[in-house]
Amino acid sequence: MYDFLTGIIKTIAAGYVGIDVNGIGFRVFTPNPYEYNQNDQTTIFTEQIVRDNQISLYGFKTVKERNLFQKLLNVSGIGPKSALAIIAGGDRDGLIAAVENGKPKYLTKFPGIGNKTAQQIVLDLKGKLGDFSKNIAPMKNLLENSAELDDALAALVALGFSSKEVNKINPKLASLGELTTDAYIQKGLKLLTK
């Protein structure tokens, strides 16, 4: 088992990076391989998964990200690809707040997570994620958004804005009343690009 790999990023592809560690190339599946730059020296914190026909390495920028991945793997019905997709969603604080406040509906916005799996995540992880975020209480307003606003916030994160930036404008967008997803995105872009 490997705790971390330090080396030079040689390959960046959809879903993984190739890291050269002293002449040995490791393929490491990551939530967002495009966070890395080719030919940069970096450290990737890894989790090795052994299956009947495959040994895979999953890598993360921080130890906290890897620990969250490990917690998600303990949920019945969540495999490495689903856990990676959840982390790739970039909304760690929203995920933690939804679990800690018992709001499975919010979790269905992550790829591959339906109602049943979302309920299982809340059931299995509630009370076990407090060490990942100290600011859970202020996140409650995030959980009371309309589906349109939730979709718009997720789209803004997908466009490259950080979850922190998007969560900061959430109250302003929510105060606008009921709008379409497109309208929320347009208003959000204006607020974020000021």
Swiss-Prot record:
<comment type="similarity">
    <text>Belongs to the RuvA family.</text>
</comment>
<dbReference type="GO" id="GO:0009378">
    <property type="term" value="F:four-way junction helicase activity"/>
</dbReference>
<dbReference type="InterPro" id="IPR003583">
    <property type="entry name" value="Hlx-hairpin-Hlx_DNA-bd_motif"/>
</dbReference>
<dbReference type="InterPro" id="IPR011114">
    <property type="entry name" value="RuvA_C"/>
</dbReference>
<dbReference type="InterPro" id="IPR012340">
    <property type="entry name" value="NA-bd_OB-fold"/>
</dbReference>
<dbReference type="GO" id="GO:0000400">
    <property type="term" value="F:four-way junction DNA binding"/>
</dbReference>
<dbReference type="GO" id="GO:0009379">
    <property type="term" value="C:Holliday junction helicase complex"/>
</dbReference>
<dbReference type="GO" id="GO:0006310">
    <property type="term" value="P:DNA recombination"/>
</dbReference>
<comment type="function">
    <text>The RuvA-RuvB-RuvC complex processes Holliday junction (HJ) DNA during genetic recombination and DNA repair, while the RuvA-RuvB complex plays an important role in the rescue of blocked DNA replication forks via replication fork reversal (RFR). RuvA specifically binds to HJ cruciform DNA, conferring on it an open structure. The RuvB hexamer acts as an ATP-dependent pump, pulling dsDNA into and through the RuvAB complex. HJ branch migration allows RuvC to scan DNA until it finds its consensus sequence, where it cleaves and resolves the cruciform DNA.</text>
</comment>
<dbReference type="Pfam" id="PF14520">
    <property type="entry name" value="HHH_5"/>
</dbReference>
<protein>
    <recommendedName>
        <fullName>Holliday junction branch migration complex subunit RuvA</fullName>
    </recommendedName>
</protein>
<dbReference type="GO" id="GO:0005524">
    <property type="term" value="F:ATP binding"/>
</dbReference>
<comment type="subunit">
    <text>Homotetramer. Forms an RuvA(8)-RuvB(12)-Holliday junction (HJ) complex. HJ DNA is sandwiched between 2 RuvA tetramers; dsDNA enters through RuvA and exits via RuvB. An RuvB hexamer assembles on each DNA strand where it exits the tetramer. Each RuvB hexamer is contacted by two RuvA subunits (via domain III) on 2 adjacent RuvB subunits; this complex drives branch migration. In the full resolvosome a probable DNA-RuvA(4)-RuvB(12)-RuvC(2) complex forms which resolves the HJ.</text>
</comment>
<dbReference type="GO" id="GO:0048476">
    <property type="term" value="C:Holliday junction resolvase complex"/>
</dbReference>
<keyword id="KW-0233">DNA recombination</keyword>
<dbReference type="InterPro" id="IPR000085">
    <property type="entry name" value="RuvA"/>
</dbReference>
<dbReference type="InterPro" id="IPR013849">
    <property type="entry name" value="DNA_helicase_Holl-junc_RuvA_I"/>
</dbReference>
<keyword id="KW-0238">DNA-binding</keyword>
<keyword id="KW-0227">DNA damage</keyword>
<dbReference type="GO" id="GO:0006281">
    <property type="term" value="P:DNA repair"/>
</dbReference>
<feature type="region of interest" description="Domain III">
    <location>
        <begin position="144"/>
        <end position="194"/>
    </location>
</feature>
<dbReference type="GO" id="GO:0005737">
    <property type="term" value="C:cytoplasm"/>
</dbReference>
<feature type="region of interest" description="Flexible linker">
    <location>
        <begin position="139"/>
        <end position="143"/>
    </location>
</feature>
<dbReference type="InterPro" id="IPR036267">
    <property type="entry name" value="RuvA_C_sf"/>
</dbReference>
<dbReference type="Pfam" id="PF07499">
    <property type="entry name" value="RuvA_C"/>
</dbReference>
<feature type="region of interest" description="Domain I">
    <location>
        <begin position="1"/>
        <end position="61"/>
    </location>
</feature>
<keyword id="KW-0234">DNA repair</keyword>
<keyword id="KW-0963">Cytoplasm</keyword>
<dbReference type="Pfam" id="PF01330">
    <property type="entry name" value="RuvA_N"/>
</dbReference>
<feature type="region of interest" description="Domain II">
    <location>
        <begin position="62"/>
        <end position="139"/>
    </location>
</feature>
<dbReference type="InterPro" id="IPR010994">
    <property type="entry name" value="RuvA_2-like"/>
</dbReference>
